[in-house]
């Protein structure tokens, strides 16, 4: 006897199988029990229990054999499921599907109602590390200056290998992770200072590192007696407390100041060798001093 959902099936006459709905089976059972064939029915029940003990009884839940695209897959970063290139909400048992990921779709197989990834590397739709992405670019296409460090939240699992240029290989940041790059040259410009991993991509677009300004060149070009910074770079651009990846070692010239730093410049007075006059104020703007300096007389 097999049970298929709410349908009961059992052997009857030779080479025949009878299937009844649950209510029909109950009525049939009462009627059959009262008949003269009840002893034979008891033998049938014994055989049924024997099949159950041996594992030959099968329960087939047709709906459960299909796989559905659910919040489980959405939480992993996937935005949909493709079956033969078409967007689908369900897939039959044994079918191979593609889960849509911003950095390339992943293959999954429907196994008894559960979507199984084809490889551990495709267990979720995460984002690639920022520094790893930059070092994968041709050298001439990389931004300059580069980020000095990158901080992620939450912190990923510690990778097992270190690749070229000391950058971790194989780190995958889960959907919803945040990233904040840090530049020794000043706050990032021309973009966002923070991004979120959304379906395999960092959004919005991160900004780039600005260029620093030279105090020496300002002093020389403007013929200033003295140039003094009135703000500090660390106040404008506090360094991160935690760094999850190896920072790029950079030697910053003490003559240079960060983007956004303000300075005052003094000209030497004409009637004195020590006094100063003609005070001018400047701000470092991505490698250039603004406003344009007026040279001392």
Curated annotation (Swiss-Prot):
What Gene Ontology terms describe what this protein does at the molecular function level? DNA binding; interleukin-33 binding
Sequence ranges assigned to domain Sushi in this UniProt record: 151-211
Keyword annotations for this protein, in alphabetical order, are: Disulfide bond, DNA-binding, Glycoprotein, Host nucleus, Secreted, Signal, Sushi
**Disulfide-linked positions:** 183-209
Gene Ontology cellular component list: extracellular region; host cell nucleus
Q: Subcellular localization, per the record?
A: Secreted; Host nucleus
Subunit structure, per the record?
Interacts with mouse IL33 (in reduced form).
Its main subcellular localisation, reduced to a broad class, is secreted
User: A GO BP term, please?
Assistant: regulation of cytokine activity
Q: Tell me which Gene3D superfamilies the record gives.
A: Complement Module, domain 1 (2.10.70.10)
**Gene this protein is translated from:** ARI
Q: Which SUPFAM superfamilies match?
A: Complement control module/SCR domain
Report the protein's function: Secreted protein which suppresses the host allergic response by inhibiting the interaction of host IL33 with its receptor in order to maintain parasitic infection. Binds to both host IL33 and host nuclear DNA and this dual binding blocks the interaction of IL33 with its receptor, and tethers IL33 within necrotic cells, preventing its release, and blocking allergic response initiation.
What the entry lists under InterPro entries is as follows: Sushi/SCR/CCP_sf
- Its protein name is Alarmin release inhibitor
The record lists glycosylation at 107, 175, 190
Q: Which organism is it from?
A: Heligmosomoides polygyrus
């Amino acid at each position: 006897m097999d049970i298929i959902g709410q349908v009961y099936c059992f052997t009857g006459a030779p080479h025949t199988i009878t299937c009844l709905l649950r209510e029909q089976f109950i009525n049939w059972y009462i009627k059959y029990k009262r008949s003269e064939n009840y002893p034979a029915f008891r033998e049938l029940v014994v055989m049924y229990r024997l099949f159950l003990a041996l594992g030959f009884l099968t329960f087939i839940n047709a709906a459960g054999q299909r796989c559905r695209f659910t919040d489980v897959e959405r939480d992993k970063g996937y935005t949909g499921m493709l079956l033969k290139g078409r967007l689908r909400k369900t897939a039959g048992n044994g079918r191979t599907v593609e889960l849509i990921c911003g950095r390339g779709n992943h293959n999954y197989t429907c196994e008894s109602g559960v979507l199984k990834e084809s490889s551990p590397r495709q267990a979720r739709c995460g984002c690639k590390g920022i520094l790893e992405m930059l070092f994968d670019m041709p050298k001439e296409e990389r931004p300059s200056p580069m980020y000095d460090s990158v901080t992620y939240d939450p912190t990923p699992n510690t990778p097992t290998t270190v690749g070229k240029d000391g950058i971790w290989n194989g780190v995958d940041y889960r959907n919803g992770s945040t990233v904040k790059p840090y530049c020794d040259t000043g706050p990032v410009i021309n973009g966002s200072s923070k991004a979120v991993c959304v379906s395999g991509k960092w959004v919005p677009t991160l900004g780039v590192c600005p260029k620093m300004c030279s105090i020496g060149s300002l002093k020389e070009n403007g013929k200033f007696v003295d140039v003094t910074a009135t703000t500090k770079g660390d106040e404008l651009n506090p360094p991160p407390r935690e760094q999850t990846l190896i920072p790029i070692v950079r030697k910053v010239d003490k003559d240079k100041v960060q983007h956004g730093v303000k300075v005052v410049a003094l000209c030497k007075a004409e009637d004195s060798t020590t006094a100063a006059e003609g005070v001018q104020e400047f701000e470092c703007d991505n490698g250039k001093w603004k406003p344009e300096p007026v040279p001392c007389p």
